[in-house]
From Swiss-Prot:
PANTHER family: DNA REPLICATION AND REPAIR PROTEIN RECF. GO terms for biological process: DNA replication; DNA synthesis involved in DNA repair; double-strand break repair; SOS response. Its main location: cytoplasm. This is DNA replication and repair protein RecF.
Length: 367
């Protein structure tokens, strides 16, 4: 799948614009602060109804404007098109529309427009808190396991009930036991989905990483959030007093993590910033391969500031891997010359110059 048309209104400093991107490679170039990243942010809003630059959406809305809007026409893998739109008002009203109908949740957008982001903050996947890695893991599971979302919602409901009981003691013994059973059942299913996903991801990740950088001894493992040799109901029973003291459940899928190690050390403690970025790129490209294997569509990759912390050899290797995915890519850079010639002759490449929020297409992929 790919964006055939993208219309952006009142996002950051961007002037209202409608773009016709290439189904493959799109390079946005211009000076720092010109608005290149805001274009990627607009696509991110369209696919996830949130920004990757700010947890608050008010700063995304252009100064003196009350609403920002992003519209996209998506070419579907199975043929045909679908129209997606998101708008956000300063007062907080968020509207999501799919083919003219109001959508129930952002998950519907995410399912139709799977996005992968690679930017200067990508190293946080290794250095950041376990929550960041759980989000990465569950993005992948969501896109390859149709049962994941419903099970995840069951898990969250059971976890909220148990945590409320731990803090306030509002459940009788029978209700508490019932919610504990539901929590354990949903947790076992989530754990199974995650384990199966990591089993499929690891060989693809290792193969992809080997094409980017040599890191002998790097391992990827999955921690499910509780002792692998014990059932969750047993762990919950033995940790009940501590859970009550803490006011929340200490064990379960909500504590899961991905662990990347180099020998006996955490990879983030050993690798340079450039090496960390290559590891993250390999992880995200591997995810794209799995999505294409399970679904008929491809991810769309948003790559912000590609040259950052990568030398020419590694930039070219990354571009080659993205090209081999046969997916749509949006890349930002200051100077496009080193990127423009790095693709196969038959690969459609479109160039967009961004200057003070104005976007001009300087090379059409159809030329």
């Amino acid at each position: 799948m790919s964006l055939r048309r993208l219309s952006v209104t009142a996002v950051r400093n961007l002037h209202p614009v409608t773009l016709s991107p290439s189904p493959r490679i799109n390079i946005l170039y211009g000076a720092n602060g010109s608005g290149k990243t805001s274009v990627l942010e607009a696509v991110h809003l369209l696919g996830l109804a949130r920004s990757f630059r700010s947890t608050r959406l008010n700063p995304v809305i252009q100064y003196e404007q009350q609403t920002c809007t992003v519209f996209g026409q998506v070419e579907l893998a199975e043929g045909g098109t679908s129209n997606l739109g998101v708008s956000r008002e300063r007062q907080g009203e968020f509207t999501i529309r799919i083919d003219g109908q109001n959508a129930r949740s952002a998950a519907q957008l995410a399912e139709m427009l799977p996005l992968q982001l690679i930017n200067p903050d990508s190293f946080r996947l290794l250095e950041g808190a376990p929550k960041v890695r759980r989000q990465f893991l569950d993005w992948g599971v969501f896109h390859v396991e149709p049962r994941f979302m419903a099970t995840w919602q069951r898990l969250q409901k059971a976890l909220r009930q148990r945590n409320s009981w731990l803090r306030h003691g509002t459940l009788d013994a029978v209700s508490q036991a019932a919610w504990d059973r539901e929590l354990c059942l949903a947790s076992a299913e989530i754990d199974e989905y995650r384990r199966n996903y990591i089993k499929a991801l690891k060989p693809v990740f290792e193969r992809t990483l080997s094409e980017l950088v040599e890191l002998d001894g790097l391992t990827l493992s999955y921690y499910r959030g509780w002792d692998k040799d014990r059932e969750l109901n047993e762990v919950l029973a033995t940790s009940l007093l501590r859970d009550q003291q803490m006011g929340h459940t200490q064990a379960g899928p909500q504590r899961a993590d991905l662990r990347l190690r180099l020998g006996a050390n955490n990879a983030a403690d050993i690798l340079s910033r450039g090496q960390q970025k290559l590891v993250v790129c390999a992880l995200r490209i591997a995810q794209g391969h799995l999505v294409s294997q399970v679904r008929r569509g491809q991810c769309i990759y948003l790559v912000d500031d590609l040259p950052s912390e990568l030398d020419e050899q590694h930039r070219r290797a990354l571009c080659r891997l993205l090209e081999e995915l046969n997916c749509q890519v949006f890349i930002t850079c200051v100077d496009h010359e080193f990127l423009r010639e790095g693709w196969q002759t038959e690969t459609p490449v479109a160039l967009f110059h961004v200057e003070q929020g104005r976007i001009t297409q300087t090379h059409d992929h159809r030329e």
